[in-house]
A protein has these predicted regions:
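Alpha4 helix (beta4-alpha4-beta5 surface) of REC/receiver domains from two-component response regulators
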Residues: 34, 38, 93, 116-133, ...
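Residue-level signal for the "D+5" position in two-component response regulator receiver
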Residues: 51, 86-89
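C-terminal output helix
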Residues: 57, 137-150, 158-162
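Short amphipathic alpha-helix used as the core "switch/output" element in two-component signaling
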Residues: 67, 92-105
């Protein structure tokens, strides 16, 4: 077996350790969304990804409004992968609403953005983001970063709620 290969036993242990639940991705770039799904598959992370394409749709989903009004109140994601530069309502407003909503206040939120602005980093943490990760431009690095994010939030991190489906 080559040095970088993963044994079937290690792969089974990795998959067994992955928490059930879905990833809520709020991303307006179809390319970045597709790349994220591809990276998760390459990392053997098979959790469902619920993709929302703008801030208004994300707020409707989280607040169970409009076409999402009949969502189960206990249906919470394992974590949220949130872009900042979104149409209609930006990622900061989505994050603020997640934190102000008692039901979603403890859901982990990973800011995943191309922003290099120090003020964005600072504001994300002021609004209680759990993590701030800059999107790598390089494909292999992007894939590795998504693998690390998924592995951490789905297998190592523990949350105080049981609402995962």
């Amino acid at each position: 077996m080559d040095k970088g290969a993963v044994s079937p036993l290690m792969l089974k242990a990795h998959n067994d350790a992955m928490r059930e639940g879905y990833i809520l991705q709020v991303e307006d770039s179809a390319d970045d969304a597709a790349l994220t799904r591809h990276a998760l598959r390459r990392a053997n992370i098979s959790n469902r990804v619920e993709l929302l394409k703008d801030g208004v749709e994300a707020l409707d989903f989280v607040c169970r409004r409009g076409k999402y009004s009949d969502r189960d109140a206990g249906d919470l994601p394992a974590f949220v992968l949130l872009d900042l530069k979104l149409p209609k309502v930006d990622g900061f407003e989505v994050l603020k609403n997640l934190r102000e909503n008692e039901r979603t206040a403890s859901v982990p939120v990973v800011i995943f953005t191309s922003s290099r602005e120090e003020k964005d980093l600072r504001k994300a943490y002021e609004l209680k983001a759990n993590s701030y990760v800059r999107k790598p431009v390089d494909f292999d690095r992007f894939t590795e970063v998504i693998r690390q994010i998924g592995s951490y939030w789905l297998s190592l991190n523990e949350t105080p709620y049981e609402g995962r489906k």
